[in-house]
Every structure is written in C-alpha cells, then in structure tokens.
Regions:
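C-terminal substrate-recognition/cap domain of FAD-linked oxidoreductases
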Residues: 2, 8, 14-180, 184, ...
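Acidic, glycine-rich loop-and-beta core segments that form the ion-binding/anion-interacting portion
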Residues: 31-67, 75-84, 466-521, 527-528
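Activity-critical C-terminal alpha-helical subdomain
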Residues: 199-263
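Short, charged low-complexity linear segments at domain edges
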Residues: 247-275, 304-325, 554-563, 589-596
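Iron-sulfur-cluster electron-transfer modules
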Residues: 277-280, 304, 310-501, 507, ...
Length: 804
C-alpha cells in the first residue's frame, strides 16, 4: 500500500521477445522503482487494439509496459533512455501507452474477436522464460500473450487463442491447446497460476508438502463434510475429471489432426441482427452489468439484465429456445440508460445491440409492441404528436410577447411533451433566448415528433417516415443549428437521425445543441443578468440521453451554480454514474412495481443529499419522478431547471407537477384499457353487441342451432369452443367496424376526463389502432374470453338480451 498518486505509463517496443526478456532482467538488476511491470506479445497488443476499435499500431513486436508513480517517472524515463534503448527498446506513442495501461485488467476484450477464447495461465521463472517462449512460438507461431512480473523472479503468463463455441467440435478439440501451453510451462520450471479443479494433483508441489498438509488440516477442521469448494485446489475425489485430463493429453495429437480436416459447421444457428450473434457469444457472463442495470433494479430478475438477455440470445441462436411475447416485452423495456456499456468487460455495445433488437422483434419477427405505442403511432401520423392532441394547437404555448422566425440558421425544437403537457420547459427556453438576445426560428405547427417512441417501440416504418419528414423540414428552412430542450429529442435528432440519414442516403448536417449548452454560453458571454433567488438547496439529475449518450454533464451544473441563492448538492450517483429515472418504457409497461422502484432509488438519493428539490431538464424524467412520487407518497419535488433560470431573470417560474399527474391519470387508464386484460374485459362488456354483428354464416349457424333441442345445442357449443380462437381472428375485421360506435362510447365511459382533442380524434384514430393492434393481441385475449363467448352464444340462443 502506498499513498494515492497518479502513475505515468511508458510502453517500450522491442523487435524480439528475447530483447524484451533481456530488458526485464536489466530492470530487475537495476532495482528501478516501478509500480507496475507487464508485457505483451505483438499479436496480443494488435488484437487488444482491434477489440477496442482503435487503429492498429504499425509496431509488430512485443512491448514492455512500465508504470511508475508520477514522482518516480523521471528516474524511469532516464533508465529507459540509458539502458533499454541500448537493448533495442523504442518508446511507443503516449496514447498507445495510456491505452495499454487503461486496458491492463481487461484481457477478455479479445473475446469480441472470437467470439470465444481459449485461455491458459501459468507462472514461469524469469530464468526459464526465454526457453519457454521460444518453444511456445515454435509450437504455435506468434501467440496472443501477456505477462506480468512477480517480485522480479517469476512471470505470470496468460495466453489466448481465439475460438468459436458455435463450432462445438472444433472448439472442444482446440481446448487441448491450453493443456499443451501449460505442459510447456511445466517443462521450463513453471506451475499453474491457479489450481482450481483441473490441477489439484499439483497442490503438494505448488504449496510444498508441509504447507499443503497444514492447509488440508485447516480445511478439514473448518469443513469436515467438504461442502465448500469441493474438489478444488487442495484435493479432488473426482476421478472422472482426472481421467479426462489424462485422456485429453494423450489424445492431443489425434485432436490436432481431426481439427485440421473437420469442416467448420455451425449447428442450427438462427439469424439475429448484424453483429448481435457474435456479441451474444462474446459475452463472458461475468455479471458486471447486473448491478448497474436500471431494469434489474426495478424487476430483480436475471432476465432483465444484459447478461440474461445475451444468454437468451445465445440459446435462441442455438435453437434451444424461442421468443414469446413476455420475452419480447423484457427486451423492449430496456430503458436505454447505457449504464451497462462502460461496465462490460468485453466492450460490447450493449445498448446499441438492444436497440437493434427492437426492430428485429417487432418488424421482422412481427411480435406486438406495447399497446400505448399503437395509439402514439396513429396520433403521430395523423397529428404529428404522441399525445393525441391537435396539430393546429402545437404552438399554443408560445408566450405572446415572444417573436420568432419561420426559418433561419438557428432554430428551437420544443418536442411533443413540452408543446402539449408541461409547456414551462419551452416557454422558459423562449424567455431565456429573448433575454440573451438570440434571433431564432421555430417550426410551429410544422414541428413533428422526434421519433423516439416509434424507434423504441420497434415501429421503424413510422420512425423512417419521421426522419424523412424532419430532415426535409430542416433543409427547407435552412436550419443549421437546432436548440433542443428534451434530452430524448436531443439524442434522436443528434444521433439516431444522423445514423438513419446515412442509411437512407439523406444529407443531414444540422448541429444539435441542448439548451443547457446554449444557456451556459450566454452566461459565459455575460448576456444574462441574474437576480438573487430565495435560498434553496437543489440537486441535479443527469438525464441519460444527454449524459451517457452525449457527455453533457457540466453545462447544466455551470448554469445552476451561476444563480445567486441556489446551493447545488450532488447525489451519490452523478454524471456518468447517475441513476436512470426508469422512464418512459417501464412507466407505460410496468408502472407498479417496476417503474416506481426505479424512480424511488433516485428520489431517495436526492433526499439523502439534503436537497429541497430536484432540477433536471428531461420532460420524461420530470414526468416519471412526479408520477412515481405521487404513487409512493414521496415528498421530493422535481422541477425543470429553466424555471430557476427565468426566476433569476425576473420572471415567475412554474411548477407543472399537477399537469403531469392529471395527464397520467388519463394516460394510465388508456394504457390499461388497451392491455390484454383491458381488451378482454371490453369484449366481455360488449359481448351482446359483438354477437349481434357476427358474419352472416355465423348468424345462419346460430339460427340452425336455435331450432335444436337444448341438449344438442350444448353439445354443438362445446364442439365450437376449441374453434373460437381460430375463427375469431378471421371474423374480427368484419365485426370491428360495426361495433366501433359502441367501443367509442365504452372508452369514454371507462376513461373519464379524456382530453377534448383526444375525444375528437378517437373516431379517426381508434380504427387505425385496432387494425394495427388486434391481430397481434387476439391470440392473447381470446383464451381469456372464449368461455364468455360460448356463454354469450348460449344466452343468445335462449333469447337472453344481456350477457350476465
């Protein structure tokens, strides 16, 4: 243990491993103070950089990594110049050294290139290292290998061979190479890095007979039944494993010959989106992603984690399991928080992979998306917003004293939620721009949705339409820079629109800036003059979509810290480690308990930080914290940060919490009504109307049955029961238009307080929603109502007018 101090890494390249080993000996002899000493073969270094997505270095030979403490770096630098250069060492560029240092604990990154690895670990005396490496090179060619110096006398060697477990026979045969590497290490005085289950027979020689017996005695005294780590490290009663190890060694020559002629056939692999199968098999199942997974925090099930999903995809690719709607729902519920990406030991682009699954599952595999998204899709196509509001009212929020242009290089994007639900976000932005002297454009009623709900829901057909429309509008209006309040809009206009523009062959060169960046610039240019606010202590919640997706962490903090009277305190998890709010996907799919649990973690953190309120900038985060707080009775308030800015500018801020709660009451009822259970209950309640509008052939059949004796009717109805789930999907397209007025009346009865615009649009939107949704919903709904249908038919035959 030493006092905390930064290190300064040096990477020294050599032409041959022999030169590098000589340098190691010189380093030991000179007793130079170096905190960390390791090395890698040329192949290891190149593969490591390739796995990280870096441009592979031109250096082909092995390299030595020296990482002294900063206070001792000058002496090490002098040693490199005086001694190692004379031995053929060449100092490689600093960025390459920094990468090698930062990646020193992540050799498993190579697995992405496999997507499987065959590792071998051993410890070799420094005196025998040269001969051992020469034999390894003669046997295998250039190995991907790294080593670390242990007390100057031994070197821990870890070698890697790339493999592919999707070729099971090849993979099994290739694994014998790891034993061959180990045997060469033993030959030159080495021993296993760890014993585990495979090398327990070597325990006496590794520990020494005296220590070995002492360890066995202690283990037996503490664990007489050998319950803990049985058959590991000290002794093994597993004779089968010992026999298998011997057989593997004896059969190695045959394995090598077999592998050379065996065709490489992947068994039963089913297609996945590009790159996803490789990533699923590259996942090492380490579980580092699990503690940071937002969905896991709310659900508590392994299936919610990236590790669980990659395991499922691996089994799916093998043909051992298939998707069902429940599993699809789990994939779609990923919050896109991106907390897992930096934790992945293999650098898998997890969030981007699960993005690809959305379109794959909904568009290609034709599973249902969440019911709410069907209404959003219909509303967006009809009125350019997800809230089923009228397009003509999109700009009603604009303050009367603010003027703007219809076109120009600098423009503002409000987004659907700020335009219709919590307008303080957009109104504040306009007032700040005015005070800062900005001239800008706003598209008004021509502004569309950013497309986030369509992309997240897997409805990529609708998302493509939105991308094309938006880019066309930007070009027509000469927009070069777009100022955006909503982080969801920011990431979709900045990242996803850019990616899709390339796919669609569209030109898209618009710079997208978050309003916090714009306000920070105005403050930095002394263009905003603030008054003192009433004293308050606030914390900042980092929205995922401008944080981990965009790296915008400091600008909103700079804005808040510039406001007199406001004390900013940090939550335990902040910036790149900030917790996700859980919205929107968990809120519309599993509001209780999943979504509430995720939000509670953040609300509790804010309270623990001593904050009076949370400031943030995301309408979805604000909506989530407000609704969850109301659900669980949490007192923490959440306010858009621009309210603090306009207050300091002399305007009155607004708390739109109640507006969020009011719209959620309606939206929650709509979601429940459109769920499988909600549709089933609607069919039960409207059974007389549905039966009265059956196709003609069913009416004739019912007429025939009505003339039969009661016993025969019951027999025929019983025979029809298994046919109903097969017949109804074909009959529903004819029934639905006839009962639409009844459905509209029913919806208004079940959803009191429905906004006037939504009520006005329902006759237009509902048929579209039902046509889109019902074919995918009916297979799940009909098993719940088949008994009700049979009972309704029986009552109808008896002349009943109403289904009880």
């Amino acid at each position: 243990v030493v006092p905390a101090e930064e290190v300064r890494p040096f990477l020294i390249g050599f032409k041959t491993m022999k030169e590098l080993i000589t340098a190691l000996a010189a380093l030991d002899e000179a007793r130079v103070a170096v905190w960390h000493v390791s090395f890698g073969s040329g192949r290891f270094l190149r593969l490591n950089e390739e796995a990280a997505g870096l441009t592979t270095t031109a250096w082909q030979g092995p390299a030595l990594l020296l990482a002294p403490l900063q206070s001792e770096a000058t002496a090490v630098e002098q040693f490199i110049s005086a001694r190692l250069a004379a031995l053929g060492g060449e100092v490689l560029p600093t960025p390459q050294a920094q990468h090698a240092w930062e990646e020193r604990y992540y050799p498993m990154r190579l697995k992405r290139l496999g997507p499987s690895l065959i590792p071998s670990e051993s410890v070799i005396p420094l005196s025998g290292l040269e001969a051992a490496l020469e034999e390894l090179t003669a046997t295998f060619g250039e190995l991907a290998m790294e080593g670390a110096l242990i007390k100057g006398q031994h070197v821990a060697i870890q070698s890697f061979a790339l493999g592919d477990e999707r070729l099971p026979l090849h993979f099994a045969l290739d694994f014998t190479k790891s034993l061959q590497v180990m045997d060469i290490a033993f030959k030159h005085g080495g021993f296993p890095y760890s014993l585990g289950m495979f090398f327990t027979a070597l325990a006496p020689s590794k520990f020494g007979e005296g220590l070995y017996q002492e360890l066995k005695n202690v283990k037996h005294a503490l664990d007489p039944s050998d319950l803990f780590n049985p058959d590991k490290s000290l002794a093994s009663k597993n004779r089968t494993l010992a026999v298998a190890m011997s057989a593997a060694r004896l059969g190695r020559p045959l394995a090598e010959a077999t592998a050379a002629v065996l065709p490489k056939i992947r068994q039963g692999e089913r297609p996945l989106p590009p790159g996803l199968a490789d990533d699923a098999f590259a996942c090492v199942q380490c579980g580092y992603c699990r503690p940071v997974c937002s969905l896991y925090a709310g659900r508590g099930w392994e299936s919610a984690t990236p590790r669980g999903k990659f395991y499922f995809l691996r089994e799916y690719a093998h043909g051992n399991i298939d998707f069902d709607q429940a599993e699809v729902d789990t994939f779609l519920m990923c919050t896109t928080c991106k907390r897992c990406n930096p934790e992945c030991q293999v650098s898998i682009p997890i969030q981007e992979d699960f993005d690809q699954m959305r379109g794959f599952l909904v568009m290609e595999k034709e599973f249902a998306t969440y019911p709410a998204f069907y209404m959003m899709k219909a509303a967006t196509r009809a009125e350019h917003n997800i809230w089923a509001e009228l397009r003509e009212h999109r700009a009603d929020w604009v303050p009367e004293d603010i003027t703007y242009k219809d076109a120009g290089p600098l423009a503002y994007w409000a987004g659907c939620t700020a335009s219709y639900v919590i307008p303080d976000i957009a109104q504040n932005a306009f007032r700040i721009f005015k005070e800062g002297g900005l001239e800008f454009a706003y598209m008004g009623t021509d502004e569309n949705c950013c497309g986030a709900p369509m992309f997240m829901s897997g409805r990529w057909d609708a998302f493509e339409e939105i991308v094309r429309y938006n880019i066309d509008q930007f070009q027509k209006r000469g927009i070069k820079t777009l100022m955006v309040s909503c982080p969801g809009c920011w990431v979709f206009l900045n990242h996803y629109h850019r990616d899709w523009a390339k796919k669609l062959g569209l030109e898209y060169d618009v710079e997208v800036r978050h309003v916090s960046e714009v306000i920070a610039d105005l403050i930095g240019g002394n263009r905003l003059q603030f008054k003192r606010l009433p004293d308050r202590r606030a914390t900042w919640h980092d929205p995922c979509h401008i944080g981990r997706h965009g790296g915008i962490y400091e600008q909103p903090r700079q804005v808040l810290q510039s406001l007199p009277g406001l004390e900013l305190v940090e939550m335990t998890h902040n910036r790149e480690h900030g917790l996700c709010c859980g919205s929107v996907l968990t809120r519309i799919k599993e509001p209780v308990p999943t979504s509430d649990r995720i939000a509670t973690l953040r609300l509790d953190e804010a309270a623990a930080a001593g904050a009076d309120l949370i400031y943030t900038t995301c309408p979805c985060c604000e909506f989530q914290f407000r609704v969850a707080g109301d659900s669980i009775g949490h007192p923490m308030r959440t306010i858009d940060f621009t309210n603090a800015v306009v207050e300091a500018l002399g305007y009155e801020g607004r708390d739109t919490t109640q507006a969020s709660l009011d719209i959620w009451v309606v939206f929650d009822k709509v979601i429940k009504q459109m769920s499988v259970e909600g549709i089933a209950q609607m069919m039960r309640d409207l059974m007389p109307e549905m039966l009265a509008n059956m196709p003609e052939f069913m009416n004739k059949s019912m007429g025939v049955m009505k003339s039969l004796p009661e016993g025969m009717r019951e027999t025929m109805l019983g025979a029809m029961r298994p046919l109903i789930p097969k017949m109804m999907p074909a009959m529903m397209p004819g029934i639905m238009p006839k009962v639409l007025p009844d459905i509209l009346r029913y919806m208004e009865e079940q959803i009191p307080g429905i906004p006037p615009a939504m009520r006005q649009l329902m006759p237009q939107l509902l048929p579209v929603v039902m046509d889109d949704m019902m074919p995918k919903m009916l297979p799940h709904v009909l098993p719940l109502v088949v008994d009700d249908i049979i009972k309704g038919m029986a009552d109808s035959l008896k002349g009943a007018n109403k289904v009880q």
